[in-house]
UniProtKB/Swiss-Prot annotation:
Name of the protein: Cyclin-dependent kinase E-1
Induction field: By auxin. Down-regulated by cytokinin.
Organism of derivation: Oryza sativa subsp. japonica
Active site feature: D158 (proton acceptor)
Catalytic reactions of this protein: L-seryl-[protein] + ATP = O-phospho-L-seryl-[protein] + ADP + H(+); L-threonyl-[protein] + ATP = O-phospho-L-threonyl-[protein] + ADP + H(+); [DNA-directed RNA polymerase] + ATP = phospho-[DNA-directed RNA polymerase] + ADP + H(+)
Entry annotated with the keyword Phosphoprotein: yes
Species lineage: Eukaryota, Viridiplantae, Streptophyta, Embryophyta, Tracheophyta
Region (Disordered): 366-397, 438-475
SMART domains noted in UniProt: S_TKc
Length: 475
């Protein structure tokens, strides 16, 4: 981990000498995101990764609100990302801290795109749907990465299109990376209450058990979000666009529930036995008493036949009862992924031979801003690429960006010195070979992975990624 010591005869931290700054590519509630390039290759650099000139996204965190330590959001990301390693999870390359002002910088491999921008490009520029092969490949890879996280007892808790990055260049072209672990948590069995963590998951992708105040929840909340993302890939617009209530730290989200009920119908205790135990269920009953929700038909909104494998998978992701909701491991075994077109490692390939690869837009780079966030650099030519881990666009967007930011109300840890967390050097991470997660067989209802006890010897290693051999033509 780089420190904040001054080097090179300047008043800038020595670790900055590793990078050639290109400019700022994003800004959010957490801080700033910069695009930089490596000046020298890493000792264990792989082909196209960690070599001289390789693009790197550097995420600078603001100080904690208390002003006496490192941002707790950054601590969460570091403690999880330094322990996990998978092809479909964003890779933490290095951690740097400037002791002078306790500013923290996380360096990631740079991804040129994210699902939010890909969906927006098809909706607003091309006016064409995303081809079935790309939709299936993006979804398969998302589930593959999520299965790895859930197998290691990690709940992401903030899955949404802007947090799903897509590589646009090099050997990893078309590979997705799950990013932004600021709200992620490790969960255990027996489950401990997680409600004290505050509001989680951006509202359009928030599971009904969270909206109804569940004190205990599982990785099933991530699968609901995946279902929402799947529908958005199919229709190019968010499935449940509720208006968020913000009157109190954790208000009753009636409008969001209303949007869900209008599509899926009203949940019942018969189909969801634990529904009556949820704290906000009585509030819901009072608000909608006498209101009849006619099931408008999810298949009509996503334009899928009710008997199609795609609709069956989507319906199982959007199951009200979290205990019955399909898991990532089960979803990977679904018939939908066994049918043509088969999913592949490069999700951005054309669906048919002879078709052109879609050229997705380049994110503007502010080349006048330095690492401290001040305006000082001379403008340079903007590089290709448009996304970075957890970034926020510098371009106005038609869909409200509050839906793309972490939720307000999350509990915060006190300011903390990094040394207390034993943040080790990241050289080992840089030398790892990402990917290779086993394809787990789907579990039955009686052995649901959400309820299994964590194995004491369970590690976070990697195995075979599980792509069928016939898919090699898609790589």
């Amino acid at each position: 981990m780089g420190d904040g010591r001054v080097g090179g005869g300047t008043n800038r931290p020595a670790w900055l000498q590793q990078y050639e700054l290109v400019g700022k590519i994003g800004e959010g509630t957490y801080g700033l995101v910069f695009l930089a390039r490596l000046k020298q290759s890493h000792p264990h650099a792989a082909a196209g990764v960690g070599r001289r000139g390789s693009p790197i996204a550097i995420k600078k965190f603001k100080q904690s609100k208390e002003g006496d330590g490192v941002s707790p959001t950054a601590i969460r990301e570091i403690m999880l990302l330094r322990e996990i390693n998978h092809e479909n999870v964003v890779k933490l390359v290095n951690v740097h801290i400037n002791h002078a002002d306790m500013s923290l910088y996380l360096a990631f491999d740079y991804a040129e795109h994210d699902l939010y921008e890909i969906i927006r490009h098809h909706r607003e520029k091309l006016n064409l749907p995303i081809n079935p092969y790309t939709v299936k490949s993006l979804l398969w890879q998302l589930l593959n990465g999520l299965n790895y996280l859930h197998s290691n007892w990690i709940i992401h808790r903030d899955l949404k299109p802007s947090n799903i990055l897509v590589m646009g260049e090099g050997e990893e072209h078309g590979i997705i990376k799950i990013a932004d672990f600021g709200l992620a948590r490790i969960y255990q069995a027996p489950l401990k209450p997680l409600s004290d963590n505050g509001v989680v998951v951006t509202i359009w992708y928030r599971a009904p058990e969270l909206l109804l105040g569940a004190k205990h929840y599982t990785s099933a909340v991530d699968m609901w979000a995946v279902g929402c993302i799947f529908a958005e890939l199919l229709t190019l617009k968010p499935l449940f666009q509720g208006v968020e209530a913000k009157a109190t730290p954790n208000p009753f989200q009636l409008d969001q529930l209303d949007k869900i009920f209008k599509v899926l119908g009203h949940p019942t205790v018969e189909k969801w036995p634990t529904l009556a135990n949820l704290p906000c269920w009585q509030n819901d009953q009072q608000h909608i008493q006498g209101h009849k929700y006619e099931n408008t038909g999810l298949h009509n909104i996503v334009h899928l036949p009710q008997k199609s494998p795609a609709f069956d998978l989507l319906s199982k992701m959007l199951e009200y009862d979290p205990r019955k909701r399909i898991t990532a491991a089960q979803a990977l075994e679904h018939e939908y992924f066994r049918m043509d077109p088969l999913p592949g490692r490069n999700a951005l390939l054309p669906s048919q031979a002879g078709e052109k690869i879609v050229q997705y837009p380049v994110r503007p780079v502010d080349t006048t801003t330095d690492f401290e966030g001040t305006t000082s650099l001379q403008p340079t030519q903007a590089p290709s690429g448009n996304a970075a881990p957890g970034n926020q666009s510098v371009v106005p967007r038609p869909i409200p960006r509050q839906m793309q930011q972490p939720m307000v109300g999350m509990s915060r840890m006190g300011g903390t010195n990094m040394a207390a967390f034993g943040a080790a050097p990241q050289g080992g991470i840089a030398g790892m070979n990402p990917g290779n997660i086993p394809m787990q067989r789907g579990a039955g209802a009686q052995s649901h992975p959400h309820q299994l006890r964590r194995k004491a010897d369970q590690g976070m290693g990697m195995q075979n990624p599980g792509y069928p051999t016939q898919q090699k033509r898609r790589f």
